[in-house]
């Protein structure tokens, strides 16, 4: 089978898994020689279809920003996926569990850009100058791969295991906050389920954002004004078992809530 046929076939398998809410075997089993280029090509097929169907691209998410997770998956870099407007929910707006497969939540810092990032090598100064503000965020990650049995190839192809996201409503200028010092707690009904801080995200969320900005320029699709960037998890992700509300509090950025309904 040619690479083009394999790309189309695996992209279709992921779409079917999402529409049926039935997980599939790891894609790497069908393509053991698959590399990052092939995985991103699979992701792009499905992203292009979403755009062709009228969905609006609003930004990017960065994954694998934890050194421990990178080691687990045998990679030395993060990955990225696409964010569409259809994936965005408001603070406390109910998200139907029936639309998800095996969801988990993680607390993150989101950056909203006000300028394009077109330099081949972006500095912290470039990022700070291009960012309108930061927000607390919760990403709902989900995997179409059975039992979350993923490696780098699987998660990249699966839009970096992204599903939905919720942004907080307290915009903060980067000059007014130290992103590395942002302590995070993720709770449900007052029980702390996850803790972390900004250093968990490649040492500084701006490191992750710089990596993404450089990568997107190399791909010919630079980050643009208005884009949302989810910079990566500040602590361990938490499986969503049933309907309920998860609250992420990030010091300096306030709180944001992800609510799930049956």
Swiss-Prot record:
Coiled-coil intervals, chain numbering: none
Gene3D superfamilies, per the entry: Fumarylacetoacetase-like, C-terminal domain (3.90.850.10)
Domain of life the protein comes from: Bacteria
Protein name (Swiss-Prot/TrEMBL): 2-keto-4-pentenoate hydratase
Record-linked PANTHER family: 2-KETO-4-PENTENOATE HYDRATASE, ACID HYDRATASE
UniProt key word Lyase: yes
Gene name of this polypeptide: mhpD
Role according to the record: Catalyzes the conversion of 2-hydroxypentadienoic acid (enolic form of 2-oxopent-4-enoate) to 4-hydroxy-2-ketopentanoic acid.
GO terms of biological process kind: 3-phenylpropionate catabolic process
Catalytic reaction(s) noted: (S)-4-hydroxy-2-oxopentanoate = (2Z)-2-hydroxypenta-2,4-dienoate + H2O
GO cellular component: cytoplasm
Leader sequence segment: none
Pathway annotation: Aromatic compound metabolism; 3-phenylpropanoate degradation
Keyword field: Aromatic hydrocarbons catabolism, Lyase
Organism: Paraburkholderia phymatum (strain DSM 17167 / CIP 108236 / LMG 21445 / STM815)
Cross-referenced InterPro entries: Fumarylacetoacetase-like_C, Fumarylacetoacetase_C_sf, Hydratase-Decarb/MhpD_sf, Keto_pentenoate-hydratase
Alphabetized HAMAP family for the sequence: MhpD
Molecular function terms from GO: 2-oxopent-4-enoate hydratase activity; manganese ion binding
UniProt cofactor(s): a divalent metal cation
């Amino acid at each position: 089978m040619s690479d083009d046929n394999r790309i189309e076939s695996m992209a279709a398998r992921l779409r079917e898994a999402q529409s049926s809410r039935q997980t599939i075997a790891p894609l790497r089993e069908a393509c053991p020689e698959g590399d990052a280029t092939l995985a991103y090509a699979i992701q792009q097929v499905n992203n292009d279809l979403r755009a062709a169907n009228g969905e609006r691209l609003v930004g990017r998410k960065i994954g694998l920003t934890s050194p421990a997770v990178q080691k687990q998956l045998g990679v030395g870099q993060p990955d990225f996926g696409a964010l569409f407007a259809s994936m965005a929910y408001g603070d406390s707006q109910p998200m139907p569990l029936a639309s998800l497969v095996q969801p988990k939540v993680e607390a993150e810092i989101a950056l909203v850009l006000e300028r394009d990032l077109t330099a081949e090598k972006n500095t912290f100064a470039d990022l700070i100058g291009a960012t309108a503000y930061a927000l607390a965020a919760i990403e709902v990650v989900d995997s179409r791969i059975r039992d979350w049995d993923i490696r780098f190839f699987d998660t990249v192809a699966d839009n970096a295991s992204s599903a939905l996201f919720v942004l907080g409503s307290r915009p903060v200028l980067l000059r007014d906050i130290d992103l590395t010092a942002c302590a995070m707690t993720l709770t449900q009904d007052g029980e702390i389920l996850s803790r972390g801080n900004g250093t968990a995200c490649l040492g500084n969320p701006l490191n992750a954002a710089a990596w993404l900005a450089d990568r997107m320029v190399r791909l010919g699709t630079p980050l643009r004004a208005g884009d949302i960037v989810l910079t990566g998890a500040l602590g361990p992700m938490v499986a969503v078992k049933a309907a309920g509300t998860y609250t992420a509090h990030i010091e300096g950025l306030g709180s944001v809530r992800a609510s799930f309904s049956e």
